[in-house]
Amino acid sequence: PGTFYSSPDPDSAPFVNIGDNVNAGDTVCIVEAMKIMNEIQVEESGIIEEVLVENSSPVEFDQVLFKLKSSK
């Protein structure tokens, strides 16, 4: 388990918003697990259709965090 963060710090804008274009390798959020901040990158290019987790919410391993419309 970990904690989902939508931005690099509380005063910053989110990494991504609904409707944003993202490229493979772009950081889309941070998940804190065991006091380590892990930057999560998107695996393929596309458009963010939905953010499925609220900021600062607990998340589990393999939980889906975003809905992405592939640009392939």
Describe each model-derived feature in a short phrase:
Residues P1-K72:
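Structured functional modules or segments
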